[in-house]
């Protein structure tokens, strides 16, 4: 469970070979972007082009107005936010070079949650009270742009520290099997994992927190992710034997 890939970034800036795995496609996207040395000049030029297109926005320029892939979208979003989010995604898909698209999907993944009617500071989905919703009018483009600028600053710092190393990002379930073709036995010097916490489905709601972006990007298992993560399903028999420390 590599989460947002912070451990992989730290390994990268120290020149340490590292492998991360996560069943959550959003976690893999974020980890990939955070450990990639993008061309800073190209990213900045692309962002300037996107900002110009945002300035030209109008509702009739939004091509995809079908939001059926988003659970209860009228409950969680205003129509204006839905259209502007769709326009940003459209610009990324149609106008951004494929090599740089993921870089801009990461700030969009944050924006889709922040402009929704979900309460701030919650991992689980809890809707704002009606009186707050009436006054909630997020500036979708500005929020997205602020996150892009923050990430560009982070990229500039990351690019200033380059050491030769290999970073691998995978989706295998380490509680079931660690593929020997990816990680050979006795080849790992250190394992970094999260501290113990409750199961994902009822306690941490890791999948619920990620579901906003996973649905927007049409990632596989977006609606059932918590069932696939730790504690999502009860196992009636041991999957493998472990040795005591």
Model-based region annotation:
Residues 13-14, 19-21, 25-98, 102-110:
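Non-catalytic nucleic-acid substrate-recognition regions in nucleic-acid-modifying enzymes
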Residues 47-50, 148, 210-216:
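Short, Φ-rich (hydrophobic/aromatic) sequence segments
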Residues 197-245:
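SAM-dependent methyltransferase catalytic-core segment centered on the flexible catalytic loop
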